[in-house]
Every structure is written in C-alpha cells, then in structure tokens.
Amino acid sequence: MSKGFLVSLEGPEGAGKTSVLEALLPILEEKGVKVLTTREPGGVLIGEKIREVILDPSHTQMDAKTELLLYIASRRQHLVEKVLPALEAGKLVIMDRFIDSSVAYQGFGRGLDIEAIDWLNQFATDGLKPDLTLYFDIEVEEGLARIAANSDREVNRLDLEGLELHKKVRQGYLSLLEKEGNRIVKIDASLPLEQVVETTKAVLFDGMDLAK
C-alpha cells in the first residue's frame, strides 16, 4: 500500500466483530500487511479513561448529549495520537467502531439530532472517513443472547439498556448501509464464526486489492 487504509468495524451488541478481528490479524500478518488494530472509545490513555466513564454500569444518570460528547472527545484524541500517525506511515488501520457508531447509537438509539452528530464527527475527524466499513449484522435478540452466554465479557452500561434501544441502533446501521452502500459492506454475523471470518477476509482483501 502506498498510503494507509482505514477500515472500521461496526455492528450491534454481540455481533462478534472483535472475535472476527482476532481471527483476521494473523492472516493479515502472514500477508506482510503492516496493521494497527484499535478500538473506540479508547485506544489511547485519555480515550481509555473516557471509555471507563462512558461504560461504567453505575453511570445510569448519564445524559444522552453528555454521552455523545464523551465519545467525540475520545475520538479526537484517538485519531490525533494513534490513528493518523499510523495512516501516514502507510499502515492498514482497523478500528473496532468509529463515526457510524455515533449515528447509530446516539442518533437513532438516543434520538439526538443526526445533523448535529454529523457535524461533530466532521469537527472531530477533520472530515476523515473510513475507506471501507464492515457492518456485522445480527438480529438484536441473538446478539444480546450471545452476550448473556459469554461469561468472560464484562457487563457495561449499554448492556443494561432495554431491547428497544438496541433495535433502534440496528435500524440506524441499516439506514446508514442504504445511504452509504459504496463504503459500507454488510456481513451476515449470524453465521458460524469461520464463515464470517472468510467472508470478511474476502471483502477486506478485495477492498485493499490484496491477493486472496
């Protein structure tokens, strides 16, 4: 790659994108791809501290706009400190959540103004968008059942939300897919992990023009 390539992974709770990423990493490294994997919120020290505030199960009183602004603050610091330098170094950067999460969760889920969210995303990123977004789609009930069955997963504040919010979030993602289908590729996350990994690999390699 002559320049960096930015990929974001998106999806409702329990879609399994983190597991897919863990399986993809050694495959990419075997290809000799210089890759950085990171996550939102978090990725850097300041971002991780903000993540703790956002996801703390005891912070049930958090206002929706406060939540949004915390995500945006984490996003900016993460980009400046970690993502942009990696892209400038020509690396493949794979982010577990990025700008679309704010639209899906705070826009569709919380009912905040989507134009305002778009403006804040633009402000925080200086207009940076992923070269490719992989959207892992799964029925809300199935995703939440996966979370409930995973005893290793730490419960966070979003896990405690009602079913209705998670359904709105999924609708938000499907709306984004319809609007930005040239950037966002839908992957059926209800399939067995091995199949999801293979599909993801094919889509990613095609997007990056890598030999399969």
Swiss-Prot record:
Q: What class of enzyme is it?
A: transferase
Keywords in alphabetical order, please.
ATP-binding, Kinase, Nucleotide biosynthesis, Nucleotide-binding, Transferase
List its EC numbers.
2.7.4.9
Give the record's GO biological process terms: dTDP biosynthetic process; dTTP biosynthetic process; dUDP biosynthetic process
Taken from the UniProt entry, a GO cellular component term is:
cytosol
Superkingdom per UniProt: Bacteria
- Which InterPro entries does UniProt cross-reference here? P-loop_NTPase (IPR027417), Thymidylate_kin-like_dom (IPR039430), Thymidylate_kin_CS (IPR018095), Thymidylate_kinase (IPR018094)
Please give one Pfam family short name.
Answer: Thymidylate_kin
Tell me the residue numbers annotated for binding ATP.
11-18
Q: Which GO terms describe its molecular function?
A: ATP binding; dTMP kinase activity
Catalysed transformations (reactions): dTMP + ATP = dTDP + ADP
What's this protein's function?
Phosphorylation of dTMP to form dTDP in both de novo and salvage pathways of dTTP synthesis.
Can you tell me which family this protein belongs to?
A: Belongs to the thymidylate kinase family.
What HAMAP family does this protein map onto? Thymidylate_kinase
Provide the protein name.
Thymidylate kinase
Gene behind the chain: tmk
